[in-house]
Amino acid sequence: SVLEIGLMLQEETEKNPKTSYSI
C-alpha cells in the first residue's frame, strides 16, 4: 500500500539522511 511504502521510505531516509525520496 502507499502508506507502507511511505513508512519504508521514511525509515530509509532516517538511516541515510543524504538520500531523499519524493512521491
Swiss-Prot record:
UniProt entry tagged with the keyword Disulfide bond: yes
GO CC term (a single one): extracellular region
MF terms (GO), sorted A to Z: toxin activity
Entry comment describing in which tissues the protein is expressed: Expressed by the venom gland.
Annotated keywords: Disulfide bond, Secreted, Toxin
UniProt subcellular location: Secreted
Main location: secreted
UniProt region (Disordered), positions on chain: 1-23
Changes after translation: Contains 7 disulfide bonds.
Homology family: Belongs to the phospholipase A2 family. Group II subfamily.
Record-given protein name: Basic phospholipase A2 homolog Vur-S49 analog
